[in-house]
Amino acid sequence: MKILLIGSGGREHAMAWKMAQNKSVERIYCAPGNGGTAKENKCENVNLEKTEELIEFASKNNIDLTVVGPEAPLVDGIVNEFKEKGLKIFGPGKVGAQLEGSKSFSKDFMKKYNVKTAEYAVFENSEESLEYLKKCTYPIVIKADGLAAGKGVVICEDYKLAEETIKAFMVKDVFKGSGKKVVIEEYLEGVEASILSITDGKAIIPFVSSKDHKQIFDGNKGPNTGGMGAISPNPYCTEEVLKSFEEEILKPTLIGIQEERMDFTGIIFFGLMITKKGVYLLEYNVRLGDPETQVVLYLMKSDFVDLINAAMDKKLSDFDIEWYDGNACCVVAASKGYPKNYSTGYEISGIDDAGDKVFCAGVKLENGVYKTSGGRVLCASARGITLDEAIKKAYTDIERIKFDGIYYRKDIGKSK
């Protein structure tokens, strides 16, 4: 079996590593991949990113299955284009992908199908939004409607920051169109949780829960990032929380997908807030999370390719996902200055010395030497019987990694 995997992050390295364990898989082409996938078992990087190039490659090389890692190609409709050419691809169609591609679309979907979520209002005019914000209770949350690489959500403590955010999103257009429309949302106090899941359109099967650490500094301080580390399972996801999630969020979501007749065979990522008033849905993503994937797939005992094939065959209800006992932790190492300005091109040592597993993201391989090429560079993932053991092992591995300006949080798994 030959697989084409689209993407270049730590998530895609984890997906490639997990899919390579399937005995039927002979080759995984990573488009474009990174320095980690370049050396991963059964993997080969191919320098392709445009949809038409990927379609041509899949056709010419008799690719059996294409798997899409990041959200942007899904929102752009890559699944529809592959299917029009008769090619097998895992991911939602363009309409289903709008659950992530447009915050207003997803909030309207939640409201229509009684998915428990925060109160909200949508604006396309900056002056109207500023007038509305004058009457709001703070803190308040402002979200760019479109894709913003995980950086389009700002929690505003006061009107001053809210005004600055609206001007940046809607007037200065910092997200190149994605913030021209905004969702202004009630702030929910609580603990965040991520539940990744897989659907064939007939059933949604949740994975083990996880917890991301979004902010750059220890103690959950500073600006949001794509994610600085994760743990799984999430200690706040009690049986009671998971039951509420299933009844008030998962089940109505599935009803909505079916009622809207969405072409949705793929991943649904539920971003949750666990509050004193119950469990709320903050957002949908239509792909695996990063860095959540690097702990969730590390705990998955079942074969990932078999699971995807069960979804493609509309037989997910028959698939019982097995998980390793214990816990997992991953710690992300970033370039100095991330998530703002940072330099790249620094030599990296220690990647191959890990006791568990290092998944590469902003890493390139030059003449056999690993070098930094992005903001989030890599992450060290580890399993342990206890959460403390998993955390300790992940930090032991991250401390082996060396590059100029390396930065990582010291409190992954310890902060609320």
UniProtKB/Swiss-Prot annotation:
Q: Which gene encodes it?
A: purD
Query: Which cofactors are required for activity?
Result: Mg(2+); Mn(2+)
* Record EC number: 6.3.4.13
Keywords annotated in UniProt: ATP-binding, Ligase, Magnesium, Manganese, Metal-binding, Nucleotide-binding, Purine biosynthesis
Sequence positions that bind ATP: 133-194
Show which residues constitute the signal peptide.
Answer: none
Cofactor note text: Binds 1 Mg(2+) or Mn(2+) ion per subunit.
Record's protein name: Phosphoribosylamine--glycine ligase
The EC class name is: ligase
Q: Which family does it belong to?
A: Belongs to the GARS family.
GO biological processes: 'de novo' IMP biosynthetic process; purine nucleobase biosynthetic process
Q: Which residues bind Mg(2+)?
A: 283, 285
Can you give the residue ranges of the ATP-grasp domain? 107-313
